[in-house]
Amino acid sequence: MPQSTDLPAWRTLSEHFKTIAPRHMRDMFADDPGRFEAFSVRLGDLLFDYSKNRITRETVATLIQLAEEAGLREKIDAMFRGERLNVTENRAVLHVALRNRSNRPIRVDGKDVMPEVNRVLDRMRRFSQSVRTGEWRGATGKAITDVVNIGIGGSDLGPKMVVKALQPYADPRLRAHFVSNVDESDLVEILRPLNPETTLFVVASKTFTTQETMTNGRSARAWFLERISDESAIARHFVAISTNRNKVAEFGIDPRNMFEFWDWVGGRYSLWSAIGLPIALSVGMDRFEELLEGAHFVDEHFRTAPFERNIPVLMGLLGIWYINFFGAQSHAVLPYDQYLEDLPAHLQQADMESNGKTVDVEGRPVNYSTGPVIFGQPGTNGQHAFYQLLHQGSMLVPCDFLAAAESHHPLAEHHDILISNFLAQTEALMRGRTTDEARQEIASEELPPERLEALAAAKTFPGNKPTNSFLYRRLDPHTLGMLIALYEHKIFTQGVIWYINSFDQMGVELGKQLAKTILAELPGDAPVASHDASTNGLIRYFKSLR
């Protein structure tokens, strides 16, 4: 198959870009009173407004043509059919099956996976309910008060983000903690205030060989046994989420306390699976299933909506427009909701691990940019950190703004202030401020003319900075499921158009392999000369400091 740059629509977009690049969105809004209606989509109570983008109707039509030429519709259908889209690992890509609330058969190698998915969901329900009601007791007969999830990457970021986002729905009697970093400080500080008699550990690793997770898991096990000197007590305080029953048993966890998932679930897409057990423990299985239902709602939208009204397709195409034609290298995710504090970190992994690729699915080097750097903070914190660069920096950074119309905690005028900032920032990024407008603002200041001109220049905002806005009634489990699925399918859309495999992560392997070699060289005082001069020098200096 040809690469993206060989597609006719790509060449058309290259020419079209020359006419769009000089235009300002101020003028686009002035010229088109129906711009908001033309460039916004409603899905349930969620509004996706993409009118503040450097696009015209012709731009959108040509981007959709690009998606069609890249075979996006066929790839969407192939994913939902269970075809092996992860070509390097020869695996299906079926996180959509995990939230398939229609129970429509989805087959891998001819076998319907839905009975197994539902069986694990039933086990999650029974287990989480028994812990939450106090029926499941620790080895000394006390109810569980703290759950410690030990995982990394997709076994940590997704569940941690969702637990934080759904904190208003959490059972206050059951506290959730997350340990990911192999830095011992992470584990030590989490464990310090905990009572082993009332602590449940969830060790989450697909292979049960992940170095960081297993190191933390073994240390947690040792901490527990130092305080409760009874190996049999492990069965009441440790459960596993894995695909590797033998390794779970070797670790000392009863395989009956293992929750399975499958190799067609990528780690960064796994929060919908048993990896989401900490979510079910925190907010209950009913809420977890509402999360699944929200994601399934978006899955059906992605699968069936025409591209011109398909939110994740439009999100992906807009990203292509800025990355490959405007030269953008980053994308900001800016939730005006403190409960979504961890969403940018989750999407950072989901996007950058998926689309940070330089070869296509046939192994050929790509000659165009692919995945951007994803970053963000909640509003209004980000306004006092990096928005200066967004407004007046030399780099173009497309932004997503997310906000709920209703707060979980109505408190004086807090929420109106928050939303006024959400709205003002998107307007300011679009409109900017001309130098003439800046001169008028400072005209009353008694300064020499040259100082006034310099100050006016400093107060000029170029504007024309693209943003998408997501506005919804309230951040509840259903809405959160929708938001996450929208971004997942945006990533899929871009991967298809770039003709890359969004579902492997070979880039994480080389450093891990080298770390094993270096780990064996760190003990003792023997000189190390097997690496480059810099690495050898760093190892020597590390040894000298110990």
Curated annotation (Swiss-Prot):
Family membership: Belongs to the GPI family.
A GO BP entry: glycolytic process
The organism of origin for this protein: Methylococcus capsulatus (strain ATCC 33009 / NCIMB 11132 / Bath)
Enzyme Commission numbers on file: 5.3.1.9
Reported function: Catalyzes the reversible isomerization of glucose-6-phosphate to fructose-6-phosphate.
Enzyme class: isomerase
Keyword flag Ribosomal protein: no
Name of the protein described by the UniProt record: Glucose-6-phosphate isomerase
